Amino acid sequence: MSHIIYEPVKQRLQRSELAVPGSSPNMFEKALKSGADFVFLDLEDAVAPDDKVKARKNVIDALQDLDWQGNGKTISVRINSIDTHYMYRDVVEVVEQAGEHLDTILLPKAGTASDVYMLSAMLNQIETSKGFKHQIGIEVLIETTLGMANVVDIAKYGREERLEAMHFGVADYAASCRARTTVIGGLNPNYPGDQWHAGLSQMLVACRAYGIRPIDGPFGDFNDPESYKDAARRGAALGFEGKWAIHPSQIELANEIYTPPESEVSHAKQILIALDEAAKEGRGAAQLNGRMIDAASAKMAENIVNTDNAINGKVVA
């Protein structure tokens, strides 16, 4: 192993991530009481141009008036992208007026590490001037070919500028690639396998190398729960920590898939016990149920046990 190890920047439980349009305040209370681990109030794609200013006011009110953290939620706001004239006001107005209640900001269409730096610099100034006692984190959407081409640099340099998590924005990524698909997160039957696997894997490796949380993005057809679960299983198998829910019906599906089964947790604990006993006897490896286990097995087992502990409120994952 290299002598350089990048520890996780910030650990949060993020199995399910509920998207809530900032222009629909009637949905805020429902999101607060939902089973989602993470909620983001959206000022970007879910809000029509004529509604942007009103949506921003709605989001500020929701952050000020509702106790998101007290209801077990990580609360975030997706601002508009840097190439729009909305982004500056999104950051300044939301953070100055309600930043004390905000956990993270979700930056869409991140293309380079400098995009993260720009947002971080704005947050530094606002937090200092307002005297905030906590630091707001940054999460980015990788949803363009430029962002995917620079994903390693974004993770590497972004971690020094508040970056906590990356999300795979499959819809805009598909458009950027000119992929032949019209269902958000859906698969083209002419492609053998999962056409998003390469992008997901590339982003995942960058995240894990530099201690950033990898989060899978949306699946558009909320009337097709089985396909949603299939996509979530693929992400979980790769090592993602959670998936978006663009409809409340998808929350429990994400929670189910990204919660390790009891049998998996039990087996992981058995691995750790067996290796602990082997270590006491001076052995680096052991056998469990007819299979060899070693230090690598312990690391995989610890990941499962830590996730289970976080879900049950014992420790942070």
Label the predicted regions.
Residues 1-317:
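Expand to "…catalyze enediolate/carbanion chemistry for C-C bond making/breaking, isomerization
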